């Protein structure tokens, strides 16, 4: 939990709140194993792989996540530690087009970078210290983001490669990678990267947030989505949460006190605005503040995960009653085969997943929620 005197403001609203007792019933290990197996099976796009890798890290190897302990992590790991994460990241790097700077060449700027944290972890903990394949792949991905990808005139990196277009999704994909790179690099170069990650969050907020406290999904470019898409708001809040966790656990945390306060406030804006629209059974709607939208378990799960993480870091328990309801809703929305039901189709944004079709990112969000809840209970 944040302790530095300059960061007391982060938890100021929690001063009158005692930590609540657990009100959510924990999802069983057997169910989580099924959810995980299904996630691995259907995660094929770059952002799905990156999100799945983050979910595996937070759930199975929490001490190696940006929420789990000091950064950088140990350079030498016990045999078998994070083997599933390392093997998947290795597979991506081995399959990388040698003529591409991005880890996967799929037309997006932000999405391939979502795999970057796991590639950096693989490089940091590699047993063959002469192997520079992973450091090269990560450096090329960073170079593409910072030096080649299109930007707005004030410096916001585009989420798309073919035109300048800002998506809320970007904050989960690229800034956490930039920040993690900085935390591992350290020194003045690392500090610059951590500040770059923060600055991207700041710029995106300026473009996407409106007076409701919620974020629009997509702005600029040849088309826009000005609705308050639940998953978009969840991506943004969760991405900023990862950047905050990275800064907080880095050796440079004391040099970025204001940035940590800002990020905490910006995350709280989204979760506070979102839970105002929670429905009686615990769900949020796909378009959060639109009564004619439909229930979406995906965004509900990720926003709940963020809220547990925020409570663990700051001691602010003001939304725990809401996220406990959300956790129970997610538990009841996972079927006997480990599939999360009642999700939005992640590629249309505006329609439910069809019968027999499931959301890869939704599967990951269940694991991220479960990991965040376990960490919250432990703290």
Model-predicted regions and their roles:
Residues 138-156, 197-199, 203:
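Short, charged, amphipathic alpha-helices and their helix-cap/turn boundaries
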Residues 1-23:
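Fungal secretory targeting signals
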Residues 22-134, 148-153, 165-169, 284-379:
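CBM-like carbohydrate-recognition segments
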Residues 7-8, 16-17, 131, 190, ...:
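Generic alpha-helix initiation/capping and coil-helix boundary signal
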Residues 165-288, 293-304, 316-345, 357, ...:
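Extended ligand-binding clefts on enzyme/binding-domain cores
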Residues 157-159, 164-165:
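Active-site-adjacent "subsite" loops/lids of carbohydrate-active enzymes
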Residues 157, 221, 347-349:
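Short gly/ser/thr-rich secondary-structure transition/capping motifs
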